[in-house]
Amino acid sequence: TPISEDCLYLNVWQPSPAPTGATVLVWIYGGGFFSGTSSLDVYDGRYLARMEDVVVVSMNYRLGALGFLYTGSEAAPGNAGLLDQHLALQWVQQNIQSFGGDPGKVTIFGESAGAASVNFHMLSPMSRDLFQRAMMHSASALAPWAVTPSEQARQRSKALAIDIGCSADEEDMDVLVACLREVSAQTILDHEWNVVDLSDAHFLADIPFPPVKDGRFITEDPAEMYAAGNFKDIDILVGFVKDEGNFWLVYGVPGFDKDTDSIIDRETFVGDIVFCHPRLNDITVERTAFEYTDWLHMDQDTMYRDALDSVFGDPFFVCPTMAVGKAHVNHGRTAYVYEFAQVASNLAWPHWMGAMH
């Protein structure tokens, strides 16, 4: 897909004949808040609109540093990408009737970072009145990669500017932002991953510029908001795939490679737990290895490989998704939960990677 800063468009599909008062489904794509587009063939909404007699909407939103640069000042207040989504939801409320949709029957849904985005709109006072239902696939705002503390976000924005060469006054963030505005978008894209410490914990699931608790759109830590019952109290659908972790493991975890069967032994398995979760102490590593070992199938050479899939996928994708479902149930709402386990027949990845993220 060609890259352009002129990207803030949305797509609308309506069934034929044109409906009146139809349900509206608004899709938010994933991609770690640094990649993605609504124009992928897999996101073509015409089939869903036709088969289910609904109006389907998707939108683009700014990504990476261009969408989530944060300085704590008006020069770069953060979460521009989420505000793009918010603006699209406002547009739906104001215009969807012209396409046969009912602004009172809007469901927002998304996958991965798109699911976290859906959850942020459920939490944000700015967005709660712009939809009625929500579906989240393979993530939520409770994922450890989905939101960053404001000070870390500020430091990463500073590091990006300095890495590009905007170091005239490191303490004046507005000056740094003004300098960044003078460089090309491609230059910013080329440098934004340099702010990630590859030796840090969770680097496989780290994102250089995720959403930030800005005090405006994201007013509090998502976990604290759920604990306090401060969220849009609605029925939801949440789900995940059977093999959430495998997609990530082939990007550097010892023993894993898309060109092999990635068979590992117990020693490698334990070492990979440390590799994926380096902040765990020795006791927790051993307990994790014990918990995820399939003791009834010790004779299967794929057992440790499959176990590490869950060791990585559970904390980053499955558990945060389930936690949101449980929170809504605890508040008397209904949460529908699914696991997607079907492996695509035309999967371009090795079959052992399964139904992956």
Curated annotation (Swiss-Prot):
Question: Mind telling me which InterPro entries this protein's record contains?
Answer: AB_hydrolase_fold, AChE-related_enzymes, CarbesteraseB, Carboxylesterase_B_AS, Carboxylesterase_B_CS, Cholinesterase
Q: What is its EC number?
A: 3.1.1.8
Q: Which GO terms describe its cellular component?
A: extracellular space; plasma membrane
Q: List the disulfide bonds.
A: C166-C179
Give any single GO term for biological process. Answer: acetylcholine catabolic process
Q: Which domain of life is it from?
A: Eukaryota
Show the Pfam families listed in the entry: COesterase
Task: List keywords of the entry alphabetically.
Answer: Disulfide bond, Hydrolase, Serine esterase
Keyword set includes Nucleotidyltransferase: no
| GO-annotated molecular function | acetylcholinesterase activity
Q: Which reaction does it catalyse?
A: an acylcholine + H2O = a carboxylate + choline + H(+)
Q: Which residues form the active site?
A: S112 (acyl-ester intermediate), E244 (charge relay system), H357 (charge relay system)
The UniProt similarity line reads:
Belongs to the type-B carboxylesterase/lipase family.
Q: How is this protein named in the record?
A: Cholinesterase 1
What organism, scientifically named, is this protein from? Branchiostoma lanceolatum
